[in-house]
Amino acid sequence: ETLPHMRNQGWGRIVNVASVGGKRAVPHMLPYAASKFALVGLSNGLRAELKQENIFVTTACPGLMCTGSPRNAIFKGKHREEYTWFSIGDSIPGMAMNAETAANQILNACQHGRGEVFIRNPLNFTIALQQMFPELTNEMLAIAARVLPEMGGIGRRAAKGHQSESNWSPSVLTTLTQRAAVQNNEV
């Protein structure tokens, strides 16, 4: 319903928040990556179609965000191990970005009419690596898949992160994620 309003006023800005996962699929997150790839494709098409109407579409591709969201994310299989990986990764300084910093980068990109914004994140190098060396990148991701938890556990059933706690999570390793969960009302 927003697009007709933008057309009537003769301009507009649309921001679609996808993910670095919409540019590079990673093991154990394939449904997530598929949805983000679809959003990136939709945004690219909209950007091309709407530019002539002075409506700019920006696609934001953040990496890991330290928001505390793993507490409410859904995990399957060996849910405790999966949750541990995500909650620790969400807490590593320099790997995960806080929401305010990401929001400022997205807002800046929108204001300047940029087509895509890759929120500063160490994982962004995998996008360029994939484009230059697709086979090497796939081999590296296959190695990563081997260190992630195997299938099993609760099978197709699902558990939320807070139902998947273990000795490692919560722990001192997940302090930043725990703080972010409180700050962002994820508790």
Show which residues each predicted segment covers.
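Residue(s) in the substrate-gating loop at a strand-loop-helix junction
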Residues: 19
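Non-catalytic terminal and boundary segments that flank Rossmann-like NAD(P)-dependent oxidoreductase
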Residues: 140-187
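SDR active-site lid
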Residues: 52-132, 137-147
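Active-site loop immediately N-terminal to the catalytic Tyr-X3-Lys motif
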Residues: 24-30
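Hydrophobic alpha-helix immediately C-terminal to the catalytic Tyr-X-X-X-Lys motif of short-chain
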Residues: 38, 42-46, 50, 60
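A short helix-coil junction within the Rossmann-fold of NAD(P)-dependent oxidoreductases
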Residues: 1-10
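Active-site-adjacent segment of SDR/Rossmann-fold oxidoreductases
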Residues: 6, 24, 45-55
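Active-site helix of classical SDR
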Residues: 35
